[in-house]
């Protein structure tokens, strides 16, 4: 009897300790990169959901940045393609202070040697050469390597009698390379003229942001110019223009919709329709 009483007493003490215990749920840290905030509507979105929607916000439709390889995976049949000119790396032709260290930093950070990726594959069974500018690497500014890779891609498309698609996204010419950067404008345009003379299709696909010397050269020379929604496309930035001209710019100035209204862009295509639209255009011009 005494042992039963002691056992009962122990159980009551254990129960009281449990009641007095701090039962508050401890705050858990959310792993980095699990969620992202949409810069347009501030919705919190799972990173995996963004990836499945090609980096387009499922709440408001805002187009976030998508890297070159994710775009190529979504564009080519079964995500299969061959990448070209992977060994090209920028030098420092003008001996610009700190430039080599900056290049090394971006190579380590992105895994890229420059901000241009060239690939060949099939879109709806049609062979196509595709160039994608990836602004993770120094805003995909156009230096000698970027211009050389784009020129090589154009010349390969001309030689193989293939259509060419270029996805632009750039801060313009690379100041660290001076005149070597600026000459890429003429070089790429000359290569495009030879592609045009061969009777081949060139589609320029403008993404956010496309500015500077890229806009002033190959970006606006497409047989068909397509843009993603709300992409900024221009030469100088809006703030530079306003401060220089001492005037207020129209609402939406330099955005894709403004350019379409004024005849500089042929169509605006949402990213989810990118592959189907390009496949249709390639089929029409085959």
Language-model-derived ranges and their functions:
Residues 117-196, 203:
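Cleft-lining beta-strand/loop regions that shape enzyme active-site pockets
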Residues 171-286:
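Conserved catalytic cores of soluble enzyme domains
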Residues 35, 54:
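Residues immediately within or flanking Cys/His clusters that coordinate Zn2+
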Residues 1-26:
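N-terminal alpha-helical interaction blocks
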Residues 66-140:
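Long, charge-rich boundary regions
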Residues 38-41, 57-60:
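Short cysteine-rich clusters marking metal-coordination/redox-active sites
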Residues 44-45, 63-64:
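Cys/His-rich microdomains that often coordinate metals
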């Amino acid at each position: 009897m005494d042992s039963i009483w002691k056992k009962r007493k122990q159980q009551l003490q254990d129960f009281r300790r449990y009641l007095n215990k701090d039962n508050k749920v401890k705050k858990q840290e959310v792993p980095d990169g699990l969620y992202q905030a949409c810069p347009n509507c501030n919705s919190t979105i799972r990173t995996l959901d963004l990836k499945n929607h090609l980096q387009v916000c499922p709440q408001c439709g805002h187009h976030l940045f998508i890297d070159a390889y994710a775009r190529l995976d979504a564009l080519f049949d079964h995500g299969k393609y061959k990448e070209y000119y992977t060994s090209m790396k920028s030098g420092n032709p003008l001996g610009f202070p700190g430039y080599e260290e900056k290049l090394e930093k971006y190579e380590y950070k992105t895994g890229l040697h420059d901000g241009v990726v060239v690939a060949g594959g099939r879109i709806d069974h049609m062979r196509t050469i595709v160039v994608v500018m990836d602004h993770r690497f120094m805003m995909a500014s156009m230096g000698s390597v970027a211009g050389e890779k784009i020129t090589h891609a154009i010349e390969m498309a001309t030689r193989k009698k293939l259509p060419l698609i270029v996805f632009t996204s750039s801060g313009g010419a690379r100041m660290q390379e001076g005149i070597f950067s600026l000459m890429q404008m003429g070089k790429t345009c000359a290569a495009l003229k030879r592609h045009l003379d061969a009777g081949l299709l060139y589609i320029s696909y403008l993404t956010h942001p496309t500015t500077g010397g890229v806009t002033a050269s190959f970006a606006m020379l497409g047989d068909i110019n397509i843009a993603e929604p709300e992409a900024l496309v221009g030469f100088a930035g809006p703030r530079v223009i306003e401060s220089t001209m001492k005037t207020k710019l129209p609402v939406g100035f330099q955005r894709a919709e403004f350019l379409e209204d004024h005849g500089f862009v042929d169509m605006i295509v949402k990213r989810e329709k990118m592959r189907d639209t390009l496949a249709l255009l390639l089929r029409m011009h085959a």
